[in-house]
Regions:
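N-terminal beta1-alpha1 cap of cysteine-dependent amidohydrolase-like domains
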Residues: 1-86
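Alpha-helical scaffold elements within enzyme catalytic domains, especially in hydrolases
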Residues: 52, 108-109
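Short, contiguous, well-ordered secondary-structure segments
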Residues: 81-85, 92, 107
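Catalytic nucleophile loop
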Residues: 84-87, 110-115
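Glycine/threonine-rich flexible loop motifs
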Residues: 90-100
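Active-site glycine-rich loop that binds ribose-phosphate moieties when present
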Residues: 99-107
Length: 115
């Protein structure tokens, strides 16, 4: 069963999610950092979210959709068990989704069409 977790600070609730909903370890996480790209320095929440996954025993792959083709994004989505988008500038992220024509990939990932 697919599950969608929405959290403004994932690192705060990560342990609860891992203990109660995600029992498997060593799952692959696509860690999408696109929303945080406009910040000049790496954001504390990005560091903390990534660390929470690593601490939980997950394999984390940093990824941005900026400048990627739809095929590259499709391949990245298909290669992981979990897709995590970090917080940041939502409008910038949406613009990148539009530029890459990848909105349907996100929809399909949530509605279970591709897995």
């Amino acid at each position: 069963m697919k599950r969608l977790f929405l959290a403004s600070e994932f690192f705060v609730v990560a342990d609860h999610i891992f203990e109660n909903f995600i029992k498997e370890k060593r799952l692959k996480v696509l860690f999408i950092t696109t929303s945080s790209e406009l910040h000049k320095e790496e954001c504390s929440w990005v560091v903390k979210d990534r660390a929470a996954f690593v601490r939980g025993g997950f394999e984390v792959k940093d990824f941005t959709i900026t400048g990627k083709s739809k095929d590259e994004i499709t391949e990245a989505f298909a290669s992981v068990d979990i897709i995590h988008s970090v917080g940041g500038n939502t409008f910038y992220y949406l613009k990148q989704i539009q530029l890459t024509d990848s909105a349907d990939l996100y929809r399909d990932a949530v509605t279970n069409k591709n897995k």
